[in-house]
Amino acid sequence: MATVDPIRYPIGTFQAPQQFEAGEVQEWIAAIRGLPSDLRTAVSGLNDEQLNTPYREGGWTVAQVVHHLADASMNAFLRTKWGVTEDGPTVKPFAESEWAKTADACLLPIEPSLLLLDGLHARWAALLESMTEADFHRTVRPEGAAGEMPLYVLTALYAWHGKHHTAQVASLRKRKGW
């Protein structure tokens, strides 16, 4: 079994749930709702030099991680909406590494992305809280993937995703003594 890089994956890799568990779903929703606050705490007090430091060698800068979380959350919110309102929609992936190179991800301060996350995650959590168990069993079909993804798995994935990237920033701060 391959060793997981603890700098790249400080909370481990994503483990997809095999079945729907209402209690777990509530934890995932809480994580999604809490991401903006958790991320703000992780980046609080960092100066421009620190924000422009890669969280690992060859990795994104802290600022790029923040902007990536905004990009990924927008995509995940839309995937959730499509999954709830359409029958098994195909959802397009986004080229994360290319998006991280765009001017808004490289040059813009992080505050616009933090503000976007505040509103978006409030809406996303409200949507998730309104969903029934049947809704969470609805699926999306990631373009190029072998099968369908139930919305409860998508929810788990993005709950993990936010914690994963927030932990990357927190880990960098700890390693650097910031």
Swiss-Prot record:
It comes from the Bacteria. Its cofactor is Zn(2+). Keywords: Cytoplasm, Hydrolase, Metal-binding, Zinc. GO terms for cellular component: cytoplasm. SUPFAM superfamilies: DinB/YfiT-like putative metalloenzymes. Its EC number is 3.-.-.-. It is an enzyme of class 3 (hydrolase). InterPro entries: DinB-like, DinB/YfiT-like, Put_metal_dep_hydrolase_YfiT. Zn(2+) binds at H68, H161, H165. It is found in: Cytoplasm. Its main location: cytoplasm. Disulfide bonds: none annotated. Binds 1 zinc ion per subunit. One of its GO terms (molecular function) is zinc ion binding. Belongs to the metal hydrolase YfiT family. Possible metal-dependent hydrolase. Homodimer. This is Putative metal-dependent hydrolase GK0616. It comes from Geobacillus kaustophilus (strain HTA426).
